[in-house]
Amino acid sequence: MKSLLKYLYSIAFRVLLLPFSLCKIRRERLVFTGLTGGSGYDYSGNPRYLSDFIQKQEPGKFDIYWMVTDPSRYRSEEKQGLHFVKHFTVRSFYYLLTASVIVTNGSYAPWFPFRKRQYLINTWHGGGAYKRIENDKPDANWATRKRAQFCAENIQLMVSSCQAANEKLFRHAFLYEGEILECGMPRNDFLVRGETVDAARKVRSTYQIDPGCRILLYAPTYRPDGENYMPDFTGLRKILEKNDEKWYVLYRAHRYSEDDASALEKTWSADVTDYPDMQELLAAADMLITDYSSCIWDYSFLYRPCFLYTPDLEQYLAKTGFYIPIQEWPFPICRNEQELEDAIDSYDAGQNRKAIQKHHQKMGSFESGHACEKVCERIRRKSICEENT
């Protein structure tokens, strides 16, 4: 019933917003949205990296508007020439339907009657092709799939991280038939190029982590059952610190999750769920522990140790499922804490690099380190350089 209501809601809004089609499209106007979970939108993700790139390369050339949940959070960014509008307001509808180019990173606004002269770019929000998305899960119904089809019909350009994403996600799950730009994810450019020093320094400064202390990032994905499968980090730290190394644990909950880090000792850990940029956390992490999250794709380009902690593998497989069998992912699968400790203890950097390189090849990686440049060239060409009025 919930999916049916969303479907009917999508149709109704398409009709209600039609009067905005009388407004003139502004060639210099760009609109960005960054999905952060549920109805939340922030200055984040691939759209943020593209927006920042444009601001740096061509300052003042475009009028850039961001649709966000809370515009008051971005006063400093407004001083740099960006505009922030509260999402899902009449004012936001006006800017969305008068921009020449719209950039989003999710199944955005199927109920928007975007116009043929507008150019909608979807960068998506996850690299690779791992867990199944909502409209492609075993229990997905026709209404959920229909909303995804509405989204696909709005899109003029998909930005892809790899060939597997083309086939499994965009063509199959979304039934998207349009153009795909095979350039990698904009947010991964600096990771692919290995330019992580500044981001790592920023994270350490934010959480006051000693320069000599190494960082373990724990970033699980969302669980439909709401369960928390956090491993015992007290035991893990003993394994990690046996060679006189000091480790600090950062906990990053999924945007849909209600988990918290209250069980972690505050002297050697921090909850970084509200930190605005996941890529900067990855850049700072010396080790990643996750489960089924697509952050393994982004992190893999750093060739650092990563482990999949999956005590609920059978349940997750039945409820959500995968596009690529988890056995073909490049990192060790750990079903319990003992297996996790053993995998960490026996880590081999050479084998890790070989497994990652093989995985990139099998997935057909498009990551180039120049995605921002390539996508922004398309934005420039489809806005100011083309007549849209």
Could you tell me what each predicted segment is?
Residues 294-363:
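Catalytic binding pocket for nucleotide-activated donors in carbohydrate/polymer assembly enzymes
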Residues 42-58, 172, 186-263, 334, ...:
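Conserved catalytic-core segment of nucleotide-activated headgroup transferases in glycan assembly
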Residues 102-124, 129-131, 275-319:
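A donor-sugar binding/catalytic signature common to diverse glycosyltransferases
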Residues 30-194:
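Active-site and donor-binding regions of nucleotide-sugar-utilizing enzymes
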Residues 1, 196, 337-389:
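C-terminal amphipathic helix plus adjacent low-complexity
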Residues 85-100, 255-297:
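Donor nucleotide-activated moiety binding/catalytic core segment of transferases
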Residues 1-38:
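Membrane-proximal basic amphipathic "stem/tether" segments
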Residues 83-88, 269-274, 329-343:
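Short acidic-hydrophobic, aromatic-tinged amphipathic segments that line or gate anion-handling sites
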